[in-house]
Amino acid sequence: DIQVVCIEFDEWPGVEGLKPLSEGHIIPEILDKTVIDRMLEIDVIEAYEVSKVLARQGIFVGQSCGAYLLGAKTLAEELKTGHIVTVFNDIGERYFSTSMWD
């Protein structure tokens, strides 16, 4: 069985485009909610910290990718068998103008 798990922040981190889908803000037209089997909320502060750890390891991504990694880790702890696939679709340089890299 394949399951689609949507990772979202538990609260809005202050970066436009990263608002949780459950808050009813702008939902992308390409999002087909019928294919999502589960929504998994990730703590925004933890995601922020994980993205900093990834940057120190040479993977320079944004906060959403920190959330994806945390989500994959959470799912891995729940699974007895299977595979988890995630995509890091963000780059850290988009957030130079924020406090993310201070």
Language-model segments: residues:
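Short glycine/serine/threonine-rich phosphate/pyrophosphate-binding segments
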Residues: S64-A72
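Short, active-site-adjacent cap segments at secondary-structure transitions
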Residues: W12-P13, Y68, E93-R94
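Phosphate-binding loop/pocket of nucleotide- and phosphate-handling active sites
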Residues: E29, K73-D102
